[in-house]
Amino acid sequence: MAPAGMSLRATILCLLAWAGLAAGDRVYIHPFHLVIHNESTCEQLAKANAGKPKDPTFIPAPIQAKTSPVDEKALQDQLVLVAAKLDTEDKLRAAMVGMLANFLGFRIYGMHSELWGVVHGATVLSPTAVFGTLASLYLGALDHTADRLQAILGVPWKDKNCTSRLDAHKVLSALQAVQGLLVAQGRADSQAQLLLSTVVGVFTAPSLHLKQPFVQGLALYTPVVLPRSLDFTELDVAAEKIDRFMQAVTGWKTGCSLTGASVDSTLAFNTYVHFQGKMKGFSLLAEPQEFWVDNSTSVSVPMLSGMGTFQHWSDIQDNFSVTQVPFTESACLLLIQPHYASDLDKVEGLTFQQNSLNWMKKLSPRTIHLTMPQLVLQGSYDLQDLLAQAELPAILHTELNLQKLSNDRIRVGEVLNSIFFELEADEREPTESTQQLNKPEVLEVTLNRPFLFAVYDQSATALHFLGRVANPLSTA
């Protein structure tokens, strides 16, 4: 690899070391100059603001207006181009933003049991989507709202100086780079191993004016931004319209409830993510297999099976095992299974925390025959509820200073993340010959009882998804 690549890898390792030393509720990672305004950009902003006319605004088209479907292949091609154009500093910025997203995601996920109670089905959360949604709102925020959002995103500020401020455009561009780095790796022979699509829906009351620079800025995060207007006075009807619109445009399973909204709400800011991972060398078993939800209850579920040399570690002290299944050279699926089903909550607390990636250093290669459920999961959550449950400042209360988003009075009804997550077999290229299956050194790993999973990309140090599967056939 070229020296620049070695320098990038070394610097990322340094950033990881700094991250490991972080303590307390806030995460302080150096160097922050990668994501804050520098003196030059601050001077340019000051000059621009001095004689700047009012930002142009527009009223979004009605939600019933005809809209072209999202072309996911074109979206993936755009992400690949983004990744191809990244220089060393861009990759460092992506790695830093990836780690910041991890820390926020762990904290949010860590409070999920208090919000959802015991999860009897399956649930999935995206740290990068959480971070991207809050960074998008930061783009439209001013004054105290911006201060609080910046603190939640993990970037400290000492004063009101511009050079202490988070640069939302840099952060959103870095988030798109994080997505691009994941997708670009699996594009050999025009066959995508991984698919990751993000769509932002900005749903407003019919009279609300959006500022064009805000909507244009969101395109740095994802090219697909859908501003639409609708009546919120009948919340059930509004939620149904949003769901119908998003399913028509994307074809994904979505969920919009507007349970936290009121009839005078004027904004629902929703982020939709679709992930599809193909498990190289795995095949779908001919018959469904038993999955034990608990000691006395089982369900029949479609199962995937494959064999290869995978990284593996069994923790005898805390009674869980980890298997790392590669998607690409640097992206992988982490499967975490308690040795005893009753220990799922304990293992979740041990592994899904800020220093949890340290145990990845203990993994070693093993020849493994792996059997696991085929996963098709949908999860939706309102960030207002999650942040409140995580005891973070109530930054997403109904009335915020979002004057960079709109000059009109805004009452936030919902800040939704909706995840559509799929794992499927990719039988084009077997990982290793199945003739080895009966050899004594082959380790049998069967996920037929509750387990945890994560999708991790080393190239951006980003955990794209964290999930818990207590029953593959139902969502929490």
From Swiss-Prot:
Q: Which residues form the signal peptide?
A: 1-24
Protein modification: In response to low blood pressure, the enzyme renin/REN cleaves angiotensinogen to produce angiotensin-1. Angiotensin-1 is a substrate of ACE (angiotensin converting enzyme) that removes a dipeptide to yield the physiologically active peptide angiotensin-2. Angiotensin-1 and angiotensin-2 can be further processed to generate angiotensin-3, angiotensin-4. Angiotensin 1-9 is cleaved from angiotensin-1 by ACE2 and can be further processed by ACE to produce angiotensin 1-7, angiotensin 1-5 and angiotensin 1-4.
Question: What keywords would UniProt list here?
Answer: Disulfide bond, Glycoprotein, Secreted, Signal, Vasoactive, Vasoconstrictor
- Any one GO molecular function term: serine-type endopeptidase inhibitor activity
Compartment list: Secreted
Single biological process term from Gene Ontology: vasoconstriction
Q: Would you list which residues are glycosylated?
A: 38, 161, 295, 319
Residues in coiled coil: none
Q: List the disulfide bonds.
A: 42-162
Q: Single GO cellular component annotation?
A: extracellular space
The record ties this protein, via InterPro entries, to: Angiotensinogen, Angiotensinogen_serpin_dom, Serpin_CS, Serpin_dom, Serpin_fam, Serpin_sf, Serpin_sf_1, Serpin_sf_2
Q: What does this protein do?
A: Essential component of the renin-angiotensin system (RAS), a potent regulator of blood pressure, body fluid and electrolyte homeostasis.
PANTHER family referenced in this protein's UniProt entry, alphabetically:
ANGIOTENSINOGEN, SERINE PROTEASE INHIBITOR, SERPIN
Family, similarity comment: Belongs to the serpin family.
User: What is this protein's name?
Assistant: Angiotensinogen
Origin species? Gorilla gorilla gorilla
Gene encoding it? Answer: AGT
